[in-house]
């Protein structure tokens, strides 16, 4: 970027970079001022002015406009403004946003073509890999989607967003091992982000449990308690002094371990005992405790109760893609479904 001034080779190069950055800020000042004020309509007006002047920053403004249009679900208008830019000259960024626009319109095959074109122009464009994976997954090419994301991770290994996206895709395919690996990396990247840690930790433990249940090797079930305890121990110091009920969270996780090991009565008893102060008033629960309780109830087979609790989730938490995939994965997992059915049948028979 023009503003990037790390390790200039000479004073002259530094001077030129500063001049370019200053010139850019001056030309884009009205648009940037509107952007900072969150006045999206004025941003669109200023971008159109800059584009009409055939400025060197015209394509940059087209991308800004496309981003706003996509946020407002106006993909057709975004597509039009991007095609106008591509008619002048090819651009990786315009191709990226055109891929996103066609993706929002539901044409995933065309989106894949545009995103591949962007990557041919810029092979290290991580965002293009991310959106390409969404379209590949939408057309059923799940392995290609995961491979695309793994390629992006090799370029940007510190990107938490990429690791979370891999985990979401793997959960949707019931590939708990790879989801667990990605979440372990994500947990490590967020080890000092106390606000994000509980949700990531809960998702990681969820994947550890489902991987152990679905694996035919009894070693994984036998080692499950140790893995969960290790994960909880790693985050205990940072969370226990924070405004977070770590003890309840830990007991819910231990209840899920007991269920996974086949001891459903003990798991159920521990779950209800640890959450008894909250279940009558779920709105008083933190979103992390609530989401973990929902997953535990689903694992136990208490679908109606879980659905009631799910309605109490804060709006932003209810839309969280990682939590959504965790809930969907446990609802559709065949091994857990068989165990629940067997447990319910035993109860009906009085066993």
Task: Specify the residue positions occupied by each region the protein language model found.
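Charged, alpha-helical scaffolding/interaction elements associated with membrane systems
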Residues: 36-37, 72, 139, 261
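Receiver (REC) domain switch/output surface
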Residues: 13-25
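CheY-like receiver
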Residues: 22-65, 69-71
